[in-house]
Amino acid sequence: MTNYRVESSSGRAARKMRLALMGPAFIAAIGYIDPGNFATNIQAGASFGYQLLWVVVWANLMAMLIQILSAKLGIATGKNLAEQIRDHYPRPVVWFYWVQAEIIAMATDLAEFIGAAIGFKLILGVSLLQGAVLTGIATFLTLMLQRRGQKPLEKVIGGLLLFVAAAYIVELIFSQPNLAQLGKGMVIPSLPTSEAVFLAAGVLGATIMPHVIYLHSSLTQHLYGGSRQQRYSATKWDVAIAMTIAGFVNLAMMATAAAAFHFSGHTGVADLDEAYLTLQPLLSHAAATVFGLSLVAAGLSSTVVGTLAGQVVMQGFIRFHIPLWVRRTVTMLPSFIVILMGLDPTRILVMSQVLLSFGIALALVPLLIFTSDSKLMGDLVNSKRVKQTGWVIVVLVVALNIWLLVGTALGL
């Protein structure tokens, strides 16, 4: 009886520790459902129905592995990816990495910020510029939570992630997708046209986020409690749960667009405003409102995550620190410029996601090299199978990017 009580107590303690260590992956996962995902998934679903769902499935599986590796690097070494690159690579390479990572972070933030502004515009009936001002204010307020530590921020962002997931359960109920065709689209690969390749690259860029690869390793580098193996085990659960939720949201986005737009003849729906306006008569005003609210929630939470990632990148690569409010102010400027110039915000969102796909390999190559180094990682070093899978992902990403560049250059 005593042994049972001891085992029961130790089991509860292990579960309590696992719960305490969960959270970083939810911050990382919010980057996988930002407004860039809304734009690319809606465009892909409206244009090609369920044919590109398989891209979301495979991109999400790749993302799970990548985020586990990133988190593992922080746990095993106590340093994040940017710091490891700084410590192991020549200075010119480090500066190159910092510049491209900042560009990627700004491209990401552009999509997130404009997406939230569009969301405010749709649900409140304000102008895009007024929506941007509201987004800026809301972002500053959310970032103030960081002063209280990482946990309050994890809870708020995790709550927003769950809200977006719940919103898309509602959207699926409204749109009633064809489950047989949906399942087929998830399993059978198809790239019918050059536009499909462009959108597939966009989906990949929107699903696997380079800035979150840098960020996740910093969120786990200061995790304490239990052994390294216990922290790693808890982190794998954290990533599996958070990324499964994010993957479901991405699939639901594309499936809803396919069911609501593609199969009703609205294959040209390509921007968020049009999607909102088209949803009202096709499904209902409630469905359109839920769409707008989920866009605001995704945009606000992901732009906060983008700001944190930018801070990690700067501190890690060049040991330079600026206050978060200064970084937030500077990174808002491109969004306001795009809005004031009257550029098509949804096109900017999709282009930013394609740009992101070029940063994936640059972040992933050193991550694979470091996590495969037994001197750095000790007992958490990558297995042979993980190494091989990681390099296959790099080759696939690079091949898709080359295909995209050649196709764009030749006007295919």
UniProtKB/Swiss-Prot annotation:
- Enumerate the Cytoplasmic topological stretches: 1-19, 72-95, 146-155, 221-238, 298-327, 371-387
UniProt membrane topology term: Multi-pass membrane protein
Gene Ontology molecular function: any one:
symporter activity
User: Which domain of life does this protein belong to?
Assistant: Bacteria
Q: Tell me the leader sequence span.
A: none
Cell location: Cell inner membrane
Instruction: State whether keyword Cell membrane applies.
Output: yes
Q: Which GO terms describe its cellular component?
A: plasma membrane
Which residue stretches are annotated as topological domain Periplasmic?
40-51, 119-125, 176-196, 259-276, 345-350, 407-412
Task: State the UniProt keywords alphabetically.
Answer: Cell inner membrane, Cell membrane, Ion transport, Membrane, Symport, Transmembrane, Transmembrane helix, Transport
TM regions (residue ranges): 20-39, 52-71, 96-118, 126-145, 156-175, 197-220, 239-258, 277-297, 328-344, 351-370, 388-406
What role does it play?
Answer: H(+)-stimulated, divalent metal cation uptake system.
Family label: Belongs to the NRAMP family.
Q: What is this protein called?
A: Divalent metal cation transporter MntH
Q: What species is given as this protein's source?
A: Shigella dysenteriae serotype 1 (strain Sd197)
Q: Gene for this protein?
A: mntH
